[in-house]
Structures are given as C-alpha cells and as structure tokens.
Amino acid sequence: MTGKITVNLPHSHDLREQNVLTHMPDGETISTVAEAMKLLGDPSRLRIFWILCHCEECVLNIADMTGMSSPAVSHHLRLLKSGGLIESRRSGKEMYYRAAETELAQALHRASEQVAKISCPDAPIPEDAHTPQNQEVSL
C-alpha cells in the first residue's frame, strides 16, 4: 500500500492500529482475494476443486463422483477455470481438468484441508492430500 494513512479511532489503545493500517492490502488486492474465496464458497465447486487437487478427471467422472449432472459440473468448471483455480487439457475428444499449478490454487487447497481438519477432526483426509497427483486417466 502506498501513502500514509492517518486515522483517529474512537478508542486509540496504542500505535498498533496505525501499523495495521500501514500494512493492510489495498482495496483491489482485498477484492481479488475475496473473489478467489467466493469461488470456493459454493459446496459443489469446493468439492470439484478438492477432487481436482488430487487427480485429473473428465466431466463425466467428476459428475459421477459428485452426484451432479454433467451440465452442472461443466458450469462449475467454467467458473473455476475463469478464476484461475483449475486448468484443462484435451486428449482426443475428451477434456481433462486438474487444479492449476499456481500459488493461489495450492494455498486455497491447503486452507480448505485445514478448515476441514479443524471443523471435522474425525473426517478422514488422504495422506497425499497436500500433493496433487494430476494423473492422466485412460478411458
């Protein structure tokens, strides 16, 4: 953030507030982070993203794994791809999807794993949960 922010808070306890405001990301950065998190705010998209963090899959298999229709899966995949969280490749007539190999996608995957672990400590989480396999699937 550029520039110095000076603010008179109703309850000024010490210089912490000024330090926090000086290091706070700008509005555009906050909006970018919020948009990325909003993408995973839908349980279906989070489920699809989680699957794709662990393996590469086609629409039909994702639909079967999630109990969703192929058109619904395709809709969610478009949103995740436009948000930069997943990527795709074509093999013949089939499109395969996987988590993007970006810091953002990896960070959101780790965050979702941690929240699941904290919220549902008895839920099984695969040992390789933090290592995307991105395996090719032959049909």
Report the location of each language-model feature.
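A composition/secondary-structure signal for short, hydrophobic, low-basic-content segments
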Residues: V7, P71-A72
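Alpha-helical residues within the helix-turn-helix
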Residues: D64, H75, K81-S82
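Generic structural signal for conserved hydrophobic packing positions in ordered secondary structure
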Residues: G41, V73-H76, A111
